[in-house]
Amino acid sequence: DRRHVLERNPNYRGEPYPGEGMPGDKEAGLLADCGKMMPFIDKLVFNAEKEAVPLKAKFIQGYLDVPEIERTEYGVEFALDMADSDRVRKEYTARGFKLPRTVDISNWYVGFNWLDPVVGKGATPEQQVRNRKLRQALSIAIDWEEYSRIFPKKGGETAMGPLPGGLFGSRHGTLAGVNPVTHRIVDGKIVRRSLDEAKALLAEAGYPNGRDEKTGRPLVLNYDYQRVPTPEIKSELDWMVKQFAKLDIQLEIRATDYNQFQDKMRKGTQQVFFWGWLADYPDAENYLFLLYGPNSKARFDGENTANYDNPEYDKRYNMLRLMDDGPAKQKVIDEMVAIVQQDAIWSFGWFPYASGAYQPWVYNGKPSIMIRDMAKYYRIDPAMRVAKQAEWNRPSWWPPLLIVLMLIGAGWGTQRAFRKRERLNARGEVLA
């Protein structure tokens, strides 16, 4: 069905609008309805649009209050349109479109398989040190800040660890949360470590200039990807190849469909891979368990896709599970994050942006992945909606007038030609 209608339940008990929020919510007007009973809307009408172009057009014209309620990428797309065109920026600004943005509580990263002899743990203490330095060098070379500039629809804030902002225990966005392996602080600013530092680590790992110091053979790594390449995906894969090439490392792309990719992950045959995680509850444990040894994907069919196994990390994770939020829990989380930063089991990637798109007559709109019943918070000004729709869609009368004039001209020309033909004699002469 292309149309779904939800109406207010007259027997619903009601629920008060929240009185607390995140920093900045009050200034954004998101707490103005504090204590009022929800929902504020009597009817919700959903129209299914198969194509993105007409959906965007209807929103721009004012015929949609929001493009989609649960999706959080349309705000990013409208913001990019504004950045690409002064005309569009002026139009969207004049119409008062609201495009609030936040950092999503999900992450994307490049992982290294702990079971792999080259990028994994290593069989001997000496090999463990070399493999760790190789992972650290690669983590420096993969420039996630550049990724977000080149692929802004998919990018976000560079991750320094496994925990996105907004969770207890996360230090994302602070100087205390900087990953010392990949970044450093210069004049109060966070900057990525240089390629020279990465190359020095690579040499210490036994691969000077990307070649095995014992055999002289070039280092070739395999990148397992979870989709068959499309033109868009190919550009991302090419970008990743270039990141490894900075260190003179050859990266072979092994892109497959998702079923084959999952099979590799379960068997533990991947080497370097791309993965992500969307939390289902807002707690640090929901991310830190992704690196807990007994959750290994290959060994126990868990969600530890890197098959990471560090006794010091696991010991702290078992402590964390029983702790309430507080200084002691923060200390344990800091220690766990520091362990995985040093081991560089992930190149931590990025936390994507979530951004909604709302008309100026829509109030209390805030993008969220964790909260799915966002519509009950919305408040609408229907009088403003009607006025803006009329203002933005005034009929243009000159096209039909032009058509009428063209028809009159064509009719006059046809009539003149007909009369001239009627006055021709047999020799083609026009009679008076």
Predicted segments — roles?
Residues 1-45, 51-54, 195-196, 200-201, ...:
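Gly/Pro-rich hinge or "lid" segments in bacterial periplasmic/extracellular proteins
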Residues 4-5, 41-47, 217-228, 252:
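Short, well-ordered beta-strand elements
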Residues 94-96, 103, 127, 132-136, ...:
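Extracytoplasmic/peripheral linker and loop segments enriched in polar/acidic and small residues
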Residues 358-394:
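Long beta-strand-rich cores associated with HINT superfamily self-processing modules
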Residues 405-420:
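Alpha-helical transmembrane segments
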Residues 422-432:
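Cytoplasmic C-terminal tails of single-pass
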